[in-house]
């Protein structure tokens, strides 16, 4: 093998590792970031690091995105939802959590500015903390769900999976042709972002992931129940949960484990 070919081979392998998962540059370093609010490019996000953080252990990285009219504090405190969408308690110290603050209490993502914000947060956090770069996730409700969907469209190679709660195409979909593990959760009587729209979001990734088409199962209205549809033949998993409810950050109620359990288990299996 010539020196030129050898060097090009090493560069190709390095690029492959960066796309498909390596430990972040922050692994092995003494961190300078701490729990709390941080700023980057004039915007804010809240960071939650496990109490027993180990700089030599790569962690999952999970973004929790707030809804319209909300903010990062609502995600952290659990205002109308379980804190961190119920995922921090299920992670049991295995994940670093980030709650970014949207502009004007939302995620319009004008000219991709919110995706760029997420990119900048990842770069800042991963340069300082130890992250498994193949294990990044995003979830959110309503506009936060729309932003999670937007990340699925434009950052499918950077994120492993998303969970979209009552989302819509309200933060754009730049790209939208790559496969990514996708979980949709939507109320059948949603008066804000209609149920059929939520189904259409999932169907994009049914196609991208090469899944076998299937009809979405729905519970009876008034049943207080839910139905899950898992698609088969997919290169990356796609599932959809239809529940008897409206536009809810906590499907079937704040005390319900439906969305937190489904999201956590989906992320870990993706």
Curated annotation (Swiss-Prot):
Class of the enzyme per the UniProt entry, highest EC level: hydrolase
Keyword Metal-binding attributed: no
Cellular compartments per GO CC: extracellular region
Coiled coil regions, renumbered to chain: none
InterPro entries documented for this protein: AB_hydrolase_fold, FaeB/C/D
Signal peptide extent: 1-21
Gene Ontology biological process terms, A to Z: xylan catabolic process
Reaction(s) catalysed by this chain's protein: feruloyl-polysaccharide + H2O = ferulate + polysaccharide
Keyword terms: Carbohydrate metabolism, Hydrolase, Polysaccharide degradation, Secreted, Serine esterase, Signal, Xylan degradation
Secreted keyword on record: yes
GO molecular function: feruloyl esterase activity
Primary site of residence: secreted
EC number(s) reported in the record: 3.1.1.73
Cystine pairs: none
Domain of life according to the entry: Eukaryota
Compartments, record wording: Secreted
Function: Involved in degradation of plant cell walls. Hydrolyzes the feruloyl-arabinose ester bond in arabinoxylans, and the feruloyl-galactose ester bond in pectin. Active against paranitrophenyl-acetate, methyl ferulate and wheat arabinoxylan.
Family: Belongs to the faeC family.
Listed PANTHER family: FERULOYL ESTERASE C, PTHR38050
UniProt protein name: Probable feruloyl esterase C
Organism, scientific name: Aspergillus niger (strain ATCC MYA-4892 / CBS 513.88 / FGSC A1513)
Recorded name of the encoding gene: faeC
């Amino acid at each position: 093998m010539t020196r030129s070919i050898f060097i090009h081979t090493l560069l190709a392998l390095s690029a492959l590792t960066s796309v498909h998962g390596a430990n972040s540059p922050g692994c092995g370093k003494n961190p300078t970031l701490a729990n709390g609010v941080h700023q980057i490019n004039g915007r804010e996000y809240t960071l939650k690091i496990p109490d027993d953080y180990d700089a030599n252990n790569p962690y999952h990285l999970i973004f929790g995105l707030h809804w319209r009219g909300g903010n990062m504090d609502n995600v952290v405190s659990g205002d109308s939802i379980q804190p961190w969408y119920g995922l921090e308690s299920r992670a049991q110290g295995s994940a670093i959590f980030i709650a970014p603050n949207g502009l004007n209490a939302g995620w319009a993502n004008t000219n991709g500015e919110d995706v760029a914000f997420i990119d900048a947060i990842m770069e800042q956090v991963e340069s300082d903390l130890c992250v498994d770069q193949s294990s990044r996730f995003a979830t959110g409700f309503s506009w936060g769900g729309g932003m999670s969907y937007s990340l699925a469209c434009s950052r499918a190679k950077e994120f492993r999976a998303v969970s979209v709660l009552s989302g819509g195409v309200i933060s754009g979909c730049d790209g939208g042709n790559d496969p990514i593990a996708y979980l949709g959760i939507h109320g059948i009587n949603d008066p804000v972002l209609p149920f059929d729209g939520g189904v259409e979001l999932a169907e994009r990734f049914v196609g991208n992931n090469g899944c076998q088409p299937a009809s979405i199962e729905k519970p009876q209205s008034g049943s207080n129940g839910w139905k899950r549809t898992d698609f088969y033949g997919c290169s990356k998993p796609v599932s959809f949960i239809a529940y008897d409810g409206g536009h809810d950050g906590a499907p079937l109620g704040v005390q319900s484990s439906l969305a937190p359990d489904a999201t956590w288990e989906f992320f870990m299996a993706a």
